[in-house]
Amino acid sequence: MTLDRLSHGPSRSHLTPLVAGLLLAGCGLALASSHREAPFITTAPKVDGTDFYMFRSYEPNRADYVTLIANYLPLQDAYGGPNYFALDPSALYEIHIDNNGDATEDISFQFRFENKLANNGAGVSLNIGGKQVGIPLIQSGTVANLKDGNLQVAETYSVSVVRGDRRTGNVQAVTSSSNGSAVFDKPVDNIGTKTIADYAGYAAKHIHSVNIPGCAMPARLFVGQRQDPFAVNLGTIFDLVNAPVGVITNPALINAAPNAIGDKNVTTLALEVHKSCLTNGDDVIGGWTTVSLRQARLLNPSPPAGYQTTEKPGGAWVQVSRLGMPLVNEVVIGLKDKDKFNASRPSGDSQFIDYVTHPTLPALLEIALALPGTAPTNFPRTDLVTTFLTGIKGVNQPRNVVGSEMLRLNTAIAAVPFALQNRLGIVGNILAGGNDNAGYPNGRRPKDDVVDISLVAVMGGLCMANGNADALGFGAACKPSAVPLGATAFKLHDAVDQAVVPLLPGFPYLNTPLPGSK
């Protein structure tokens, strides 16, 4: 997406006073995580991306690493057996990195999955009255180890790194640092405490040290089920923001409502890579995640015995899911274009420009809250264009940026230990006068409350900071008088506190998944 005012500037590891003023207002438009956000993706939950995170690792002794996390398969009930939540072996899951600001991937990490029955495809059988009969469950006993013999279904995956175009670039296998294998084991989902007594310990055995071709330092890799790390007042928001204005504008009530998805799990693809492997002469990188499916599929009306034998896919890869900033497609892109956005690449984002320059969400909030005349009046919304499409100059804008939607991270800004992180990222840090410049919108950490930050921006917080003298360069129309809410815009929240979500202090950072039974 392009506008005359899209700026080009060098990245910096510090915050100028001008930038501090901008960040005080908050950035983004997300009101909910990317769960079931587009019509087509509701039919294919295994390839539905829910959240994307990209941040400097804050685990001790990992300061020079960047963690990439892509979550898929939303709203998993922990008790969802007997098949649980294996990922799609017919899909291509990818994490893309743009390291020169041109809106095109320079590095892609590709994940492919394979799910096989034990005993060379024969599965597990029991002797029942002299006959060997296959069992109906994915496990035949307790599970504790890699390649556990009591698992009837073995879930494995491979990872490749592609340099250049995702389909025509140079493809090389990511391999285990310990044995050179290009195939990795995925832990079974958290069936329950009787089957897996120590799931945290079991899952930790599936954290792999890996070698990435072209990278001098080894990386870490984990794929498996986690507790959904996102906190949001989901049902209330989509029910026309069914909450009193006095609650969502009172900072003392930031945790007045329960987290609607606090009892759900997701499936995580996590990769921790040395920052030198991701950058290319600029400290700022952009990232996003996608999934593609084969263009055609045949369904066998008489599938043979085995595992997932009904479908036979073929043809070219077709992208069906896309997620960068949290979350554009859910509450910014119009319903008629949601599937189109999921199929698009950042280089083609000019087709969606009106959704950012003239967003409908503020007007919808006026209707939902019965507060006419509260939406900002500055058009085009150059404040939001900067946040979504270029990054913020002096923080996370690449030197030669082409306007496009993706999450952007300045890898030169140091990580902050978990206990010292501000849940409002850079916005909260400015308010507190602290030293945490490593959070959203400079990348995104699991603790960052992107919902609350985003509500501030969508209702005009950036223009409040821009002032009457166009201090931030958003144009003369972006000024306090264009923000009917005034200072109240800084108090908005969804009444669910991201900071209370349980998280781990180190890789893969997201909490142990909830068990199917206790």
Predicted regions mapped to residue ranges:
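N-terminal secretory signal peptides that target proteins for export/translocation
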Residues: 1-13
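Short, functionally important structural connectors and interaction interfaces within domains
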Residues: 15-16, 258
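Bacterial N-terminal signal peptides
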Residues: 16-27
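Surface-exposed extracytoplasmic segments
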Residues: 31-518
